[in-house]
Amino acid sequence: MSLFNTVRKTIVPVHKEGYPFVAAFFVASLILGWIFKPLFWIGMIFTLWCAYFFRDPERVTPQDDDLVISPADGKVSAIQMVTPPAELDLGSEPMLRISVFMNVFNCHVNRAPMRGRIVSINYRSGSFVNAELDKASEDNERNGLVIETRHGQIGVVQIAGLVARRILCWANPNEPVDAGERFGLIRFGSRLDVFLPAGAAPRVSLGQVAIAGETVIAEFASTKGPIISRRS
């Protein structure tokens, strides 16, 4: 194995959405270093920190249509039955909601929790209160996806927070999506809510750390065989 391949496999890649920020910090480091040499190294610390914020590591996703995979890195902050947001058009019956809160140190890339077809994408403007608060689901700026799966329609909602005020989503309606596939990003943390229909049982507990594209957060009843995985 060449040195280049070794380095490439060791260094976690940076998502392209982070390139402008990393470049800006690097240029600022050069300017500061020209003014006063030690400032260059201080600037480089912030440059590396920014690259870390926008890291986009590969994940090994279980390939089982009965499993619901975490859409975000972070801490499970809520597991409850609630009425889904009206803009998702998922009805008025309570659904299982599992929330994952991302802090500024978590990976910001969001991934699809199940395989299916994207039915709709709905953006709603709002406020920017602390995303850990329950009212953030109703009050904060958010972007919701509805995905048609073998178990019915599910909702995935990106929620802005106190620090994170930029939601990105590059998915499109009527597109197929795989479990663990990247579909969006929230700059500098926040929260993801997953809304699941009847038949889904949680497989995580409050406060548990979840990994996007890998951690099973819920499961639908099944009698199928062994689970395989796919890198994404």
Curated annotation (Swiss-Prot):
Annotated catalysed reactions: a 1,2-diacyl-sn-glycero-3-phospho-L-serine + H(+) = a 1,2-diacyl-sn-glycero-3-phosphoethanolamine + CO2
Entry note: cofactor: Binds 1 pyruvoyl group covalently per subunit.
EC number: 4.1.1.65
Superkingdom per UniProt: Bacteria
Gene Ontology MF annotations: phosphatidylserine decarboxylase activity
Predominant subcellular localization, coarse grouping: membrane
The record's account of how the chain is modified after translation: Is synthesized initially as an inactive proenzyme. Formation of the active enzyme involves a self-maturation process in which the active site pyruvoyl group is generated from an internal serine residue via an autocatalytic post-translational modification. Two non-identical subunits are generated from the proenzyme in this reaction, and the pyruvate is formed at the N-terminus of the alpha chain, which is derived from the carboxyl end of the proenzyme.
Keywords: Cell membrane, Decarboxylase, Lipid biosynthesis, Lipid metabolism, Lyase, Membrane, Phospholipid biosynthesis, Phospholipid metabolism, Pyruvate, Zymogen
Record site: Cleavage (non-hydrolytic): G189, S190
Functional pathway: Phospholipid metabolism; phosphatidylethanolamine biosynthesis; phosphatidylethanolamine from CDP-diacylglycerol: step 2/2
GO CC annotations on file: plasma membrane
Residues that bear Pyruvic acid (Ser): S190
Active-site feature positions: S190
The keyword DNA-binding appears for this protein: no
Localization terms from the record: Cell membrane
Topological type in the membrane: Peripheral membrane protein
Cofactor(s) listed in the protein's UniProt record: pyruvate
Any one GO BP annotation for this protein: phosphatidylethanolamine biosynthetic process
A Pfam family annotated for this UniProt entry: PS_Dcarbxylase
Subunit annotation: Heterodimer of a large membrane-associated beta subunit and a small pyruvoyl-containing alpha subunit.
Family note: Belongs to the phosphatidylserine decarboxylase family. PSD-A subfamily.
Functional description taken from the UniProt entry: Catalyzes the formation of phosphatidylethanolamine (PtdEtn) from phosphatidylserine (PtdSer).
Protein name: Phosphatidylserine decarboxylase proenzyme
Species per Swiss-Prot/TrEMBL record: Rhizobium leguminosarum bv. trifolii (strain WSM2304)
